[in-house]
Amino acid sequence: EWCEVKVYQPWSAPLLHINLSESQIKDLLQITDTISKDTNRVSYNDKLAGEIENEWEIPTSNDMTPQTLKFHSFKNYIDGLVWKYLKTLASQYHIENDEIPEPLVIFKNNIENIKIISAWFNDQKDDEYNPAHDHTGVLSGVLYLKIPEYLPSRKHHNADGSIVFISNECKTDGIMTNSTLLLSPEVGDLFLFSSSLKHQVYPFRTADEKGIRRSLS
């Protein structure tokens, strides 16, 4: 019989992955569709690294519009995810009596007052991409609302349209550790991660070159 096994890994922040419900996806599609059709929508191109034409701001103000109300409702869900993230992060430390380790105290104290600094969505088309980059702030997230059918990759590994997370740690051995994680997202996937974690998005191809992949960050 095994004794209790504990695992510690305080030298890296985790990547949280969860699937949204159909109702959440529907609400977020309604928000982004409305913005897409708004002639007064605000471009986010000059604030982002992506080689993507259609990048639009999602207002995070307290204006009582149907879109902002729905988005604020979704923010309550994000608040809960951040708590899950903190618990996972704390579990990587050596913890006695459920005490939060000192490096995370400030994080914990601010969780009840989470502020979304900025929000936007991308409508990515054929051959558009996001180069390796990171974000400001403490935590970042990306979720997927639309994904077209891609043409088969020209190579055997089928990485077209993938998102790649890149470790900030320079030294990896390729056996027990790896410097990158490549994921092929599906509709409803949400990833939450440290804003300092670099990531990039590969381009894709569709049969009619009119496919749109919508992601929200």
What spans do the regions from the language model cover?
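Short amphipathic alpha-helical "recognition" segments used for binding
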Residues: 79, 206-207
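Catalytic core of non-heme Fe(II) oxygenases with the double-stranded beta-helix
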Residues: 113-192, 200-202, 208-212, 216
